[in-house]
Structures are given as structure tokens and as C-alpha cells.
């Protein structure tokens, strides 16, 4: 599971404008990185421009999926992942990023600009692209599910060890039943012996 790109874009006019972005291109060779980076920007601008406000879309392109959400303010976030990255954590992260970005850069700051500049950068994107390579970090439900799965594994191990003990307990129970049978046998034998010698 891998996140390759996170971008925040201003929607409106003829073309979307990338305000800030972060990329993890470590899986690509040095010579591919520039072309891949340009393609990711182009893909993000195209997809976000064609996503209506309030709508979420996941678009598959080759081995990659672009998850996008456009807010009513005209701000969109695009995350490009591989096909294995779960959808819910991607959208959870998109919502988080857009909320934080809007609190730092209100709509009036970027609504009417024609070109981006360093003042629109959002340094947390670099942190997020590293941290959220593990999708359970973005999605608390997924994190709880992962913890439950781990607990389930521990419980299965505990149950297996109890069953092994249980097998030993069963053999003890069998032995105690055997004692009980021999005790019964002794009792019956003693009863027979006592019954044949009746004193008159």
C-alpha cells in the first residue's frame, strides 16, 4: 500500500490550480521522476476540475487510483495511491487535510489568484505522505479493526493453549473415571463377598 501524491487544488475558471503538494517518488527511477511528477499534477488538475462540489471520486489509471473530493468553497484535495490502498482511509485523510488547510488559508486568500506561490504551501503534507503510508493511521475504524484482529490472534493462541491443557485435563478426567470404576468394582466385589457370608 502506497501513497504517491497529495495535492490541494483551487477549482474554478478554465483550469484547476495546484496550490501545494507532496510526492513520494522513491519507487521510481531518477530519470522517471520528473515525468511522473508532471503526470500526477496534470491528472490531479484534470480530475479535480471535473469533480463537482461535494462529490467524491476514485478514478483508476493503470496501477494507480486518484481519490478526490471537492468542497463547496472551491478547494479540492487529490490523493494518488496504488490499488491496494483502502478507499475509506484515503477520504478520511482528504477531509482532514482540507479542514486544516482551510483553517490556515481561508477562501479569500486563494479564491482569485492566477498563480500559486510559496505562501500557499502546507508543510504538513510532507509529514502526512510519510505517516499515512500505513492506512490505519488515517482511519481510526481501521486501526480499531487491526487491534481487534491482533487481539483475536492472541485469543486464538490462548484458546489453543487451553485446548492443549484441556486434552490433559480430559486424560485426568478419564483417569478419575477409571478410579471411580475401580472403586465401584471394589464396592461391588465387597458387597458380593459380604452377601455370601450371612450369619444366622
Curated annotation (Swiss-Prot):
One of its GO terms (cellular component) is endosome. Residues 7-126 form the Longin domain. Keywords: Cell membrane, Coiled coil, Lipoprotein, Membrane, Methylation, Palmitate, Prenylation. GO terms for molecular function: palmitoyltransferase activity; SNAP receptor activity. It is found in: Cell membrane. Residues 140-200 form the v-SNARE coiled-coil homology domain. Its main location: membrane. Pfam families: Longin, Synaptobrevin. Transmembrane segments: none annotated. GO terms for biological process: autophagosome-lysosome fusion; endoplasmic reticulum to Golgi vesicle-mediated transport; intra-Golgi vesicle-mediated transport; intracellular protein transport; vacuole fusion, non-autophagic. CDD domains: Longin (cd14824), R-SNARE_YKT6 (cd15867). Belongs to the synaptobrevin family. This is Synaptobrevin homolog YKT6. The gene is YKT6.
